[in-house]
């Protein structure tokens, strides 16, 4: 169910003529909200037989805001909706998220346990992993890190998903 609509301000309904970006807050959602360097999910919210594109999802204080492109579809607080993520895109993001973990583990193996994540960006097409180290990596170190990551991928280990807070994740080596 739609809990809130946010256009230029919070409102109870958006009439037929509404076009442009709005935020929908639902009572529950399968969408991942942008956070920790990872982009938010996209997909559709189905309402009254029409599909409303979700172009991004943000999370703020535990509230998921679905950023939607309205094309005149009327939406009101209380409407029953079905939320569907773009599963192909989500899978690509999930794989890149896992690659970031593999990269960090390989960096720690090659460079030492002092390596810590200093930032990251994960989307469906790429991963950027920022880390702290006291010198530039050599060509040999880069090759060893790449080989370790590729070996882990080829092993095809089952992926275990754990949801935790940042502090616990850091203690566990993330």
Spans of model-derived segments:
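A glycine- and charged-residue-rich anion-binding loop/surface
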Residues: 1-174
